[in-house]
């Protein structure tokens, strides 16, 4: 049964939570909003406590803002161990990917997991290579699924009383299409996902244009989930 209360007043992250409308407009997979939003959590060493907050683009991309802020606070030394999880409305561009890799090379005790709602300009070869290089360097990059949307709603959003279980339900197919394209990027395959926009009605359309290499390299369970492969029906 859902709680009739909103986030507890004792929650130390309450003042840093974003509003429900912000979460909906920033993290909707079909909404191609230009601005980016970052929800993040940090676990320091063996501590059981998790520090959560959020950030948005300024004159710099939100990823760079985070790295600069964390470095300037003085808590992070070359031997400091911490685990960082990002929930990004857009995946990092190639320049941010380079900055992230440079940061991690200077702080080998830091681990980073990145969940993204959308892929930023995924047709750009530099952005594709940047994401691939992140994964190669040990960063976990994944597309947000239903469980991540639920988690973010409960832990980062100032939801109204009685709305703890009422996070936005976006069609899983959009998430699967982005996940398929991310898989293509990691494997070094050509783009498979095409996104088009009709500006008059502000409608976003997703389509898949697979090639032979996609069918050859991508696991069947992913192709089945996105409808690119039909399940076999046994003969009787």
Curated annotation (Swiss-Prot):
Annotated consequence of substituting residue 61 to A = None or little editing activity
The cellular location(s) given in this protein's UniProt record come to: Cytoplasm; Nucleus
The listed outcome for residue 61 to C is: Retains most editing activity
Q: Which residues form the active site?
A: 63 (proton donor)
| Primary location | cytoplasm
Q: Which cofactor does it need?
A: Zn(2+)
- Note the InterPro entries from the entry: APOBEC/CMP_deaminase_Zn-bd (IPR016192), APOBEC1 (IPR041547), APOBEC_Cyt_Deaminase (IPR050610), CMP_dCMP_dom (IPR002125), Cytidine_deaminase-like (IPR016193)
| KW Transport (keyword) present | no
Coiled-coil region list: none
* Residue intervals of the CMP/dCMP-type deaminase domain: 10-134
Q: Which GO terms describe its biological process?
A: cytidine to uridine editing; mRNA processing; positive regulation of gene expression via chromosomal CpG island demethylation
One GO molecular function term? zinc ion binding
User: What Enzyme Commission number(s) appear in the record?
Assistant: 3.5.4.-, 3.5.4.36
Q: Which UniProt keywords apply?
A: Cytoplasm, Hydrolase, Metal-binding, mRNA processing, Nucleus, Zinc
Task: Report, as the record phrases it, the tissue specificity of this protein.
Answer: Expressed exclusively in the intestine.
Q: Which reaction does it catalyse?
A: a cytidine in mRNA + H2O + H(+) = a uridine in mRNA + NH4(+); cytidine(6666) in apoB mRNA + H2O + H(+) = uridine(6666) in apoB mRNA + NH4(+)
**Cross-referenced CDD domains, in alphabetical order?**
cytidine_deaminase
Q: Where is Zn(2+) annotated to bind?
A: 61, 93, 96
Per UniProt, the cofactor note for this protein states: Binds 1 Zn(2+) ion per subunit.
Q: Which GO terms describe its cellular component?
A: cytoplasm; nucleus
* Listed Pfam families: APOBEC4_like (PF18774)
As for family, the record states: Belongs to the cytidine and deoxycytidylate deaminase family.
Q: What's the stated role of this polypeptide?
A: Cytidine deaminase catalyzing the cytidine to uridine postranscriptional editing of a variety of mRNAs. Form complexes with cofactors that confer differential editing activity and selectivity. Responsible for the postranscriptional editing of a CAA codon for Gln to a UAA codon for stop in the apolipoprotein B mRNA. Also involved in CGA (Arg) to UGA (Stop) editing in the NF1 mRNA. May also play a role in the epigenetic regulation of gene expression by participating in DNA demethylation.
Q: What assembly does the database describe for this protein? A: Homodimer. Interacts with A1CF; form an mRNA editing complex. Interacts with RBM47; form an mRNA editing complex. Found in a complex with CELF2/CUGBP2 and A1CF. Interacts with HNRPAB. Interacts with SYNCRIP.
Cross-referenced PANTHER family: C-U-EDITING ENZYME APOBEC-1, MRNA EDITING ENZYME
Please report the name of this protein according to its UniProt entry. C->U-editing enzyme APOBEC-1
Organism, as annotated? Oryctolagus cuniculus
- Classification of source organism: Eukaryota, Metazoa, Chordata, Craniata, Vertebrata
